[in-house]
Amino acid sequence: DTYMTNQIELAAKTTKDNQTDYDGLYELHWKNGQDFNMRSSILGGELQALLEMRDGNNSENFSATLTKYTAGSAEDNTAATITLKASQADSACSDNSWNLSKLNIPESDGKLKIYNYEFQYDSFEVSVSADGSYEYTFTLKKPLNAGQSGHLDVALKRGKTTSTIGDDVGFRGIPYYMAQLNEFVRTFSANVNQIQNTGYDLYQEKGCDLFVAAPLADGTEYEMAELLYNKTEGCYYLNGEAQKGLAGADVVYTFSSK
């Protein structure tokens, strides 16, 4: 008898691929410890259909370009960071990397994949420039060791700088439609708030936001800045006022996931 069998085990994920992912989604492993390729094209059957429905993002996972990093230090209590750049002109960047209304990456517990190596991050910050380019600074959970720093050095030297979050799943599953819903809510809210901010009430007071978000922790409201790009005029509108600056110069908006 030369046949061999191996069993599949379920394990709760400790990281997320999308902003709207539920905590502890299952991933599959072979019982002998080997990785199970959930994206294999030969998987087939009900299992592949289930995974595509759960993880399908219409091949719209996040992608941007690595520009620099800091290694951090446990002794100095400094965090490691990875910086990415995204713009419409860069073909390596996904549409949702240079458009806040489409952004769908986890606030924390996400994984950056750079040159076939994964880095887990704790939070990130985005700076948007007047030319429409985005700069992401990801704060990693742990300082980088010598091997990880060397890997990033090699990636930068060889031009292997494409950095992704989540898998490319060519199916319109739950993550795709959740992202579509988020984009609609953000765009609608921003446009309505922009109209509110440019007007005045009956007491001649400047209008304020109609749509706001309240964190569950303390009940306070987020301060939402409406960032809308007008292609005709070539500038951003921030809270109803045009933000015009030299290309690549002025930062008109900064957002943090913390």
Report residues per predicted region.
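Structural signature of extracellular appendage/secretion-system components
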Residues: 1-258
